[in-house]
Amino acid sequence: MKMNKLVKSSVATSMALLLLSGTANAEGKITPVSVKKVDDKVTLYKTTATADSDKFKISQILTFNFIKDKSYDKDTLVLKATGNINSGFVKPNPNDYDFSKLYWGAKYNVSISSQSNDSVNVVDYAPKNQNEEFQVQNTLGYTFGGDISISNGLSGGLNGNTAFSETINYKQESYRTTLSRNTNYKNVGWGVEAHKIMNNGWGPYGRDSFHPTYGNELFLAGRQSSAYAGQNFIAQHQMPLLSRSNFNPEFLSVLSHRQDGAKKSKITVTYQREMDLYQIRWNGFYWAGANYKNFKTRTFKSTYEIDWENHKVKLLDTKETENNK
């Protein structure tokens, strides 16, 4: 296969953009509201909502914790977003001779957006900063009067005045968590992106790594290998779990509702995966790799109505969106 033909094919493919969207045929389930009276001031109301995209293999599990505090002039909602986002991994064809490719889960995005007026705002969230740890753990605590604290670990920072607590705990080997740039008082979002990936002791490599001769060696097994192209990738089990399997997100957001505002509001929760295209080719002398970022994007959104007065939620809509280069 000639190089110019390969380059033209790659360019033509990258220039083509296909955008497909529509309402998902997703099943949603909401549990009955459970009530827990902490004391004569604070009452907790809890319900869990699930929505799935079978097509994209994305599952949202949202836990809504309403906090009614007589010593505070606002309503508080602690929303925990968990579930599953499949990587979309597609392994290479082992019979490919001098050119082969695979698709891998390079980045996962989760966001929560308040669709209401100024009566409902995002006032806190976790994680709060960039995190490159193998395991991300945070604990949120709510104390009387609307005070919120977020600490590292699964129990640190709590005291006897804590009326409610919630934790997050997820793994991100070779990936890192960053806060979305458009995070503000109406939106909060996180990205969990491939960051430092080792290849048999070499590296670390990332999505943008580049060697002037061998290109991006992210998943390249050997520069001078005599194997077929489809067999010259590192073994699948050597790839980071998030690149080839699933990501199980756990994020927290805190929404505050002014009691003299509208009794109902809307929020939209978005789960997304970005798949990169990684390919290798033999040029007659050596193997070289190339990584094309965000080659396929799959997005699943759910919109809920929040009933602040009755501490209930209602699934209004779900939407699936595909974006292919």
Curated annotation (Swiss-Prot):
- Signal sequence segment: 1-25
GO cellular component entries: extracellular region
Gene3D superfamilies from the entry? Leukocidin/porin MspA
InterPro entries per the record?
Bi-component_toxin_staph, Leukocidin/Hemolysin_toxin, Leukocidin/porin_MspA_sf
| Molecular-function GO terms, alphabetical | toxin activity
Q: Which domain of life is it from?
A: Bacteria
One of this protein's GO BP terms?
cytolysis in another organism
Pfam families for this protein: Leukocidin
Q: Which UniProt keywords apply?
A: Cytolysis, Hemolysis, Signal, Toxin, Virulence
Q: Member of which family? A: Belongs to the aerolysin family.
- What is this protein's function per UniProt? Toxin that seems to act by forming pores in the membrane of the cell. Has a hemolytic and a leucotoxic activity. Promotes host AMFR-mediated inflammation by mediating 'Lys-27'-linked ubiquitination of TAB3, TAK1-TAB3 complex formation and phosphorylation of TAK1/MAP3K7. In turn, activates host NF-kappa-B signaling pathway.
Q: How does it assemble?
A: Toxicity requires sequential binding and synergistic association of a class S and a class F component which form heterooligomeric complexes. HlgB (class F) associates with either hlgA thus forming an AB toxin or with hlgC thus forming a CB toxin. Interacts with host AMFR.
What's the protein called, per UniProt? Gamma-hemolysin component B
At the highest ranks, the source species' classification is: Bacteria, Bacillati, Bacillota, Bacilli, Bacillales
Q: Gene name on record?
A: hlgB
